Design a protein with these regions (language model features):
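C-terminal regulatory/interaction regions
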Residues: 245-311
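Core dinuclear metal-dependent hydrolase active-site scaffold
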Residues: 27-28, 138-167
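Conserved beta-strand hairpin/beta-sheet module of binuclear metal-dependent hydrolase folds
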Residues: 2-54, 58-60, 164-174
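Divalent-metal (often Zn2+) His-rich catalytic cores of metallo-beta-lactamase-fold enzymes
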Residues: 203-254
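Metallo-beta-lactamase
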Residues: 60-72, 99-152, 206
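Residue-level marker for buried hydrophobic side chains located in beta-strands
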Residues: 34, 65, 89, 171-173, ...
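Active-site metal-binding loops of divalent metal-dependent hydrolases
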Residues: 38-40, 69, 94-95, 157-158, ...
């Protein structure tokens, strides 16, 4: 399913697990069309068919940009690169080597996801190294002469996370940096997985995006939303709230996951059960608790003390 959501921007529902409105890719059209996010490998056949339905032939796609290399965002990149042989693949420098040789990434994912890896996500096929371009802060990717996407380094969710600024439409493609905002759910929900989550970096990244005064945020999970600055502020408050609850639990010797469930899962009580299950499949309390717990532990070790108020 595709939808033009702004001038020259097409939202493509990549349907992770066959679910609608859970994972999105975005095609920015022009003389050199650019695909942002591929979704998982399990979504690749659908994505390829949708691109072809939009008139994108194998020789047309100029670039693929990945906000980060988690499998729900990048798992299909090897398949897309194979079908669209002229497309360059843009990624954070720390992610480039994993696209060329994904063996370590797949091994790690196997330990995290277990049987869900193959049933829900699929794997990640290698991308030819000569087609991978490492993106730095401020680099641009041309769409049409005089029009481009600009890369912002936005670590926090993952250390190798980047976002993309499309000034003509005021759209910031934010990946998972701001969290998850599914249409059927409505509320913003954090995404703080291990091993890289870092509160200070995450909030700095949201400020960096806010400095561009975007009118819209385009989430990988899911869709393009107005009132971008308000959502960015909400995202900062949300991350700080979750981290404060987790820190208090750690100081009190309580299970962080239990404390977070008690504090925030009641916010989901009025949701349709299917919508709630989709949200928690994408960004469950268990994974978020693991990420925050790891961050708190690393911060304590760095500071040489048990705790300090969350930023």
């Amino acid at each position: 399913m595709t939808e033009f959501i702004a001038d020259n921007i097409v939202e493509i529902d990549t349907q992770l697990g066959g679910w609608e409105h859970i994972t999105a890719g975005y095609l920015v059209t022009g003389e050199s069309p650019v695909l942002i996010e591929t979704g998982s490998q399990s979504s690749a056949p659908l994505l390829i068919a949708e691109l072809q339905s939009l008139g994108i032939s194998p020789s047309d796609l100029a670039a693929v940009v990945l906000t980060h290399i988690h499998l729900d965002h990048a798992g299909g990149v090897g398949d897309i690169a194979r079908v669209f042989p002229k497309a360059k693949v843009y990624v954070h420098p720390s992610g480039a080597r994993h696209l060329a040789d994904p063996s370590r990434l797949i091994n790690s994912a196997s330990m995290v996801y277990g049987p869900l890896l193959d049933s829900l996500y699929g794997r990640l096929d290698p991308t030819p190294a000569d087609r991978i371009i490492a993106v730095e802060e401020g680099d641009t990717i041309e769409i049409t002469k005089g029009l481009h996407l600009e890369a912002l380094m936005t670590p926090g969710h993952a250390k190798h996370h980047l976002s993309l600024w499309h000034e003509p439409t005021g759209t910031m493609f934010c990946g998972d940096a701001v969290g998850v905002k599914l249409p059927e759910v409505g509320i913003l929900w954090p995404a703080t997985p291990p091993p890289d989550f870092d509160l200070a970096l995450a909030t700095q990244s949201l400020e960096a995006m806010k400095s561009r005064s975007p009118s819209h945020l385009a989430f990988a999970h899911y869709g393009r939303f107005a009132n971008a600055v308000d959502i960015l502020d909400e995202g900062k408050d949300l991350l700080r709230d979750w981290c404060r609850v987790a820190e208090a639990a750690m100081v009190d010797g309580r299970e962080i996951e239990t404390a977070l469930e008690e504090a925030f899962v009641p916010d989901l009580k009025d949701l349709d059960p299917t919508a709630r299950d989709r949200l928690l499949t994408l960004s469950g309390v268990h994974a978020n608790a693991m990420g925050i717990s790891r961050w708190l532990t690393k911060r304590s070790e760095h500071n040489g003390q048990n705790s300090r108020p969350a930023d």
